């Protein structure tokens, strides 16, 4: 293992839940306002995961007041406090960009049934 890979291994978070595109997750991340820091939640559907190792990112989409909002988070960022899987979704694609064009009930994703 070379030097860069060993440094990346030290920075990678270990306690992350497993989630895939189609899952609804809640990301609690730290926001700095002035001189104080608070935790803000962002809940939505994962529409993509990309990269690997320390530079892996994921994009979460939600509808806020009728407007679609997408936010891309680095998976191992220190600003992310926690990630919680709300529900598992059943999709057959790795990139769910088609959700951008859908509105209302058509934008819903089937829930993955667990036995």
From Swiss-Prot:
Q: Does the keyword Lyase apply?
A: no
Question: What Gene Ontology cellular component terms go with this record?
Answer: cytosolic large ribosomal subunit
Q: Which SUPFAM superfamilies match?
A: Translation proteins SH3-like domain
Please give the Pfam families that the UniProt record associates with this protein: Ribosomal_L19
The answer to whether UniProt assigns keyword Ribonucleoprotein to this entry is yes
The family line of this record is: Belongs to the bacterial ribosomal protein bL19 family.
The protein depicted here goes by the name: Large ribosomal subunit protein bL19
UniProt organism field: Desulforamulus reducens (strain ATCC BAA-1160 / DSM 100696 / MI-1)
Source lineage = Bacteria, Bacillati, Bacillota, Clostridia, Eubacteriales
Q: What gene codes for this chain? A: rplS
């Amino acid at each position: 293992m070379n030097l860069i890979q060993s440094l990346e291994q030290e920075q990678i978070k270990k306690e992350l839940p497993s989630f895939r595109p189609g899952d609804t997750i809640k990301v609690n991340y730290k926001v700095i306002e002035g001189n104080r820091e608070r935790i803000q939640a962002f809940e939505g559907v994962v529409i993509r995961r990309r990269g690997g190792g320390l530079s892996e990112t994921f994009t979460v989409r939600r509808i806020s007041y009728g407007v679609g909002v997408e936010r891309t988070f680095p998976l191992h960022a220190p600003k992310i406090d926690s990630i919680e899987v709300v529900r598992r979704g059943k999709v057959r694609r790795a990139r769910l960009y088609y959700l951008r064009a859908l509105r209302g009930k058509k934008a819903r994703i089937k829930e993955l049934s667990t036995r």
